[in-house]
Amino acid sequence: MDINASRALANVYDLPDDFFPKIDDLVRDAKDALEPYWKSDSIKKHVLIATHFVDLIEDFWQTTQGMHEIAESLRAVIPPTTAPVPTGYLIQHEEAEEIPLGDLFKHQEERIVSFQPDYPITARIHAHLKAYAKINEESLDRARRLLWWHYNCLLWGEANVTNYISRLRTWLSTPEKYRGRDAPTIEAITRPIQAAQGGRKTSSGTRKPRGLEPRRRKVKTTVVYGRRRSKSRERRAPSPQRAGSPLPRSSSSHHRSPSPRK
């Protein structure tokens, strides 16, 4: 990957959360962009990675939504005097990345016990579900940003998306009174390029070759008796003189002047 594209991809993580579409809208837009490539069995880098994130987000999103629904339904059976587990006792996303998946439940259970050894079982399940759902949501946010990057690279081109992220970051980091009212859009950035490409497609005629061309004579000439004569002009009737003889005089000089000697 180009160094500028790599930097732009890293900057995607710093963009505001509300810049990106909601999960449902994002997946739908990504599928629309990927459908032509799926039909042609394309193996482009952006197609493969975007397809992976579409599948990942759909699975994670459904699982996370299920966790939230179960956790909410458990609230009715949790004793009303039970205090919620503080955030500091719940495993965070950064910690979960360092813990093997099979040990995640054990680590979270140990933290709940350290908070309150006799914590009610229903409240424990609720705490587990809330912790796992939070981890999934943060993973989904990262996957959502990456999916946005890859399917937009298919739609607009990697160079255009890189340019757009750079301009957007500059606009966001500029104090409000020194910047334009509206943030830059990728459509506005790519419109001049599309217009130029469209103009080239509709132009008629042959393309002029690069470099210098040999200068061509409009009228081809030849040399006759030391004089240059155009081939495009009418040729006179051949004169009866021999080759090398003097040229005939004009019609006005055909008759000799009378000789002074008779």
UniProtKB/Swiss-Prot annotation:
GO BP annotations, alphabetical order: microtubule-dependent intracellular transport of viral material towards nucleus; symbiont entry into host cell; viral penetration into host nucleus
Domain of life: Viruses
GO cellular component: host cell; host cell cytoplasm; T=4 icosahedral viral capsid
Alphabetical list of Gene3D superfamilies matching this protein: Viral capsid, core domain supefamily, Hepatitis B virus
Keyword Lyase (UniProt): no
Motif Bipartite nuclear localization signal: chain residues: 215-233
Region Disordered, annotated ranges: 183-262
InterPro entries named among the record's database cross-references: Hepatitis_core (IPR002006), Viral_capsid_core_dom_sf_HBV (IPR036459)
Comp. bias intervals (Basic residues): 215-234, 252-262
Annotated GO MF terms: DNA binding; RNA binding; structural molecule activity
Keywords, comma-separated and alphabetical: Capsid protein, Cytoplasmic inwards viral transport, DNA-binding, Host cytoplasm, Host-virus interaction, Microtubular inwards viral transport, Phosphoprotein, RNA-binding, T=4 icosahedral capsid protein, Viral penetration into host nucleus, Virion, Virus entry into host cell
Summary of the function given for this chain in its UniProt record: Self assembles to form an icosahedral capsid. Most capsid appear to be large particles with an icosahedral symmetry of T=4 and consist of 240 copies of capsid protein, though a fraction forms smaller T=3 particles consisting of 180 capsid proteins. Entering capsid are transported along microtubules to the nucleus. Phosphorylation of the capsid is thought to induce exposure of nuclear localization signal in the C-terminal portion of the capsid protein that allows binding to the nuclear pore complex via the importin (karyopherin-) alpha and beta.
Family that this chain belongs to: Belongs to the avihepadnavirus core antigen family.
Quaternary structure note: Homodimerizes, then multimerizes.
Protein name: Capsid protein
Taxonomic source organism: Duck hepatitis B virus (isolate Shanghai/DHBVQCA34)
